[in-house]
Amino acid sequence: PARGQLPALVPVQDPNTQASFVAQRILELRDEGIELEEIAVLYRAHYQAMELQMELTNRGIPFNITSGLRFFEQAHIKDVAAFMKLAVNRKDEVAFKRIARMLPGIGVISASKLWLEWLNSPITKSDDPPISFSEHLEKFKVPSKSKNTWIQFGYTMDELCPDGELAPPREMISSILGGVYDDYMRSKFTNYDNRIQDLEQLKRYSEQFDDSTDFLGQLALLSGVE
């Protein structure tokens, strides 16, 4: 029987180079007459596909994910983005309420009440972030069950905007993972380790950006992060 083409082992320098190679090979196969829907890319773990999904999106190559959601559409990616979006834009109601509902004892109604208190606090009254979020947040009326995590949330926001300045995206992600979100993720998701790998991959990607606003803009282009 006739043999097909043998697999090729292609050494590459990094995940970005690998993604570029795979995307280029897909285009070559398409030009040879193979339909895109007949081409598949296999990978061992979801986080390994981040760069490839970005490359395919940037090149306008349509694709479907059969192993779940696209990388940037996953809940934990959007959760981390919410913290960053709130640091960049303190009047982002969607981001604030998403974060608030992660905290124990806070539901839809409590999140709405806290949002109004946040909106009317000194936190939103200046164009620049406050020197200390935690100083203001400790005065908020929160359910007793939420008090400790609410205070921790304030400390996390302090780290995202040290001395009233936005931290670089890599530092922001590290602070979010080292703060209140890690406890939430451990209690919420059964595949905690896989999601941590995703977020470590996101952190590596963020090293390309010095400005958190630019980083969030790129995420929005790639995935429509709300």
Language model features with spans:
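Short, surface-exposed acidic/glycine-rich loop or hinge patches that mediate macromolecular interfaces
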Residues: 16, 46, 70-71, 105
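Glycine-centered flexibility sites
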Residues: 4, 33, 67-68, 105-107
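Helicase P-loop NTPase motor core
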Residues: 1-62, 85-89, 120-123
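Conserved helicase C-terminal RecA-like lobe
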Residues: 35, 49, 53-55, 59-61, ...
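Structured loop/turn residues at secondary-structure junctions
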Residues: 14, 44, 68-69, 207
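Conserved beta-strand termini and adjacent loop/short-helix elements that scaffold enzyme active sites
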Residues: 12, 66-68, 218
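Conserved RecA-like helicase motor-core motifs
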Residues: 60-70
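Conserved short loop/turn motifs at secondary-structure junctions
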Residues: 39-44, 69, 100-102
